[in-house]
Amino acid sequence: VVGLVIGGYFAWYVYTAMYQPNIWTANGKPISFYVYPNESYASVETKLYQKGLIINRKKFEWLSEKMKYPENVKVGHYRIPNGMNNNDLINMLRSGSQAPVNVIFNNTRTIEDFAVRISEQLLLDTASLLKVLSNSAFLEPMGFTPDNVKIMFIPNTYEFYWTVSAEAFVKRMNHEYKRFWTDDKKQLA
């Protein structure tokens, strides 16, 4: 009988550690949470606690260890909803299941201003983006040069993963440029 009680308690503990809602957000809405390069599990854990997101720290820490999250911290931008359970949170963070960010740009006068504006919204830095935007060999197959590359960027709101590379960002913007400037639009212009 004692064994059944102990076994039942353990099963209840595991179940609640995994599936009981353990995330609380102040306004009840999802929050953005960023994990930076070279950030440790301890740092991620501290940020979650400082934001007041984790209701039961012991169960979060126990399950994190069991699911090997400390060895699998992934960089990214995550959307954490109110009422999420530990299992879903840890799976999202350790698998790198990012939520896209909205990247908005308009009224940038120079390519340098543009690169600064983009690096304020994504993980990539201004220097790496400027390096790609000045690389003739990279731009030429797309039909651009460092002198005319600014016309590729059509002001709008775009969704990107926060960790996108400078090269992937420019390739995506080239795709958006081609999608916008159809043959019909080119003839009208």
Q: Where do the PLM segments sit?
A:
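Conserved catalytic or metal-liganding residues and their short signature motifs at active sites
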Residues: 1-189
